[in-house]
Structures are given as C-alpha cells and as structure tokens.
Design a protein with these regions (language model features):
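Active-site-adjacent bridging/hinge elements
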Residues: 1-3, 75, 128, 132-133
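ATP-dependent phospho-/nucleotidyl transfer catalytic cores
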Residues: 4-99, 109-113, 212, 222, ...
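Hydrophobic "anchor" residues on beta-strands that sit immediately upstream
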Residues: 95-97, 117, 129
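Conserved catalytic-loop position in the HRD/HxD motif
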Residues: 101, 121
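Conserved protein-kinase catalytic-loop position immediately C-terminal to the HRD catalytic Asp
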Residues: 105-106
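Active-site activation/catalytic loop segments of kinase-like enzymes and analogous catalytic loops
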Residues: 124-166, 183-204, 216
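All-alpha amphipathic helical-bundle segments outside canonical DNA-binding/catalytic cores
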Residues: 167-183
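ATP/Mg2+ or Mg2+-diphosphate-binding catalytic cores
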Residues: 185-239
C-alpha cells in the first residue's frame, strides 16, 4: 500500500538502486541460459521495426542536443545507423529473462527497512542479456555524479548476487565489458525519447524526460565508450 514509482527525471537513490539490482540479479541468475524463456524473435524483423523510430529520433536529437553533444554525437548516429549490430549482439550474448524496459518508472519502491521493491511492466520481457537491464537502470536512474561515484560498487553488488550460487562462470571483467557494450542500448533509448519530443500527443513531461535521459546517456557515452565496446564485441562474435 506504501509502494510508489518515481519519475524518470527524479530517478532513485543509490541505496534504492542497490536493492533493485539485487532483485534483478536474483531473477537473472534464476533464468540464466534457461531455454524456456521466449526469444526476441526474428532479428531482421526487429531491425525493420526499430529502424524508422531510430531515424525519427536522430533528427530530433541532433536538432535539440547536437551543440551539447560534441564529438559524442557520432556515437548516437552510429547506433542509429547500426541497429543490426546491437540487435545481433543482444541475441548472441548470454541469455536470461531480461526485463527489456528496466527504468525507474517500472519499479515499485517501498518504505520497508529491507528496501523491498517490485519490478512491473514486463511487456518487453524475454530472452536477452541481463546486463542490458543493468546498464539501462544504472544510467537512466541515477544522476551523472551518482553514477560516476557508485557505478563500480553497484556493478559489484549485482555480480556478487548474480553468481552467488556458482552454477555458471561469468567474471566481473567479462561482465564490465558487456556493461560497456550494453550502454549503447541506452543511447538508442535516448534516440527514441528524443523522437517523442517531436511527436504530437506525447506525454506532457516528455521534454523533461528526454533532457534528463540525454544528459545521462551523453555522460555514459563519454565515460564508457559503448560504441567502441560494441564494435569489439561484434568482432569477437564474428571471428
């Protein structure tokens, strides 16, 4: 009864983020490489579906934020032009039950001392890399300063819970590389949100949401070089 959601602009506290990551880590661990989890479907169909929104979003993003982005704008453009790359990477990475839209609005937070939280809105749930959920949540839920300060400890908490039962081998170093590559998906999400600012009938706070997400993903692009990591991951997969 005391559960609440938070807005994308407000985000959540670091302590709340820690407990959310513990929660999703337990889910990811439970369904790690579980073939019963439905896949995302045909790759070509996914690319065809996401291409037009990406192009629409790119026009809006470049116009609204181009002067702020500097050299990092090229990473957003690359993500727009290479939908196939990140869809293939998503399909070829270690699979688990991924939420697919893991942002603060899709978590019910409580005031319980245990930090209990409930993950909601699983309409995009299915087989995918769990680290994509993690990257989306950390980057979109925390301020730039909070992420930079606490990113490493949050990732270690997630990794410790994920691998606690020792049933699969996934080193922290491997996971951090995957986290960098997965951050490219947050750039794509920023494209989509920017596109909604140029779409009639969008929610009234879409400009504030888009501005906040762009600021956070821009910093992530500068800090993590996600496109570079994604390119390296694709080269490994195709070798």
């Amino acid at each position: 009864r005391d559960a609440r959601t938070v807005s994308p602009t407000e985000g959540c506290s670091v302590d709340e983020a820690t407990e959310v990551l513990r929660n999703i880590a337990r889910i990811h661990s439970r369904f790690w490489n579980d073939h019963r989890v439905p896949s995302i479907g045909d790759i070509a169909e996914s690319v065809e579906r996401w291409g037009p929104p990406a192009n629409h979003g790119w026009i809006a993003l470049a116009e609204r934020y181009g002067s702020k982005a500097g050299d990092a704008l090229a990473q957003f453009e690359w993500v727009k032009d290479n939908t196939l790359a990140w869809v293939e990477h998503r399909a070829g990475s270690p699979q688990t039950l991924a939420h697919g839209e893991f942002q603060p609005e899709n978590v019910l937070f409580t005031n319980e001392p245990t930090g209990k939280n409930v993950l909601i809105d699983w309409q995009f749930g299915g087989a995918g890399p769990g680290i994509c959920d993690v990257a989306m949540f950390i980057i979109s839920s925390l301020t730039v300063e909070e992420r930079r300060t606490h990113e490493d400890s949050l990732l270690k908490t997630y990794h410790d819970v994920l691998t606690a039962d020792g049933t699969f081998d996934y080193s922290f170093e491997e996971m951090f590389f995957d986290y960098r590559a997965a951050a490219a998906m947050t750039l794509f999400k920023a494209l989509l949100k920017a596109g909604w600012t140029a779409t009639p009938g969008s929610r009234s706070d879409i400009f504030e949401i888009s501005d906040a997400l762009f600021e956070r993903t821009l910093a992530a692009a500068q800090d993590l070089a996600p496109v570079e990591a994604l390119k390296e991951a694709m080269a490994r997969n195709r070798a």
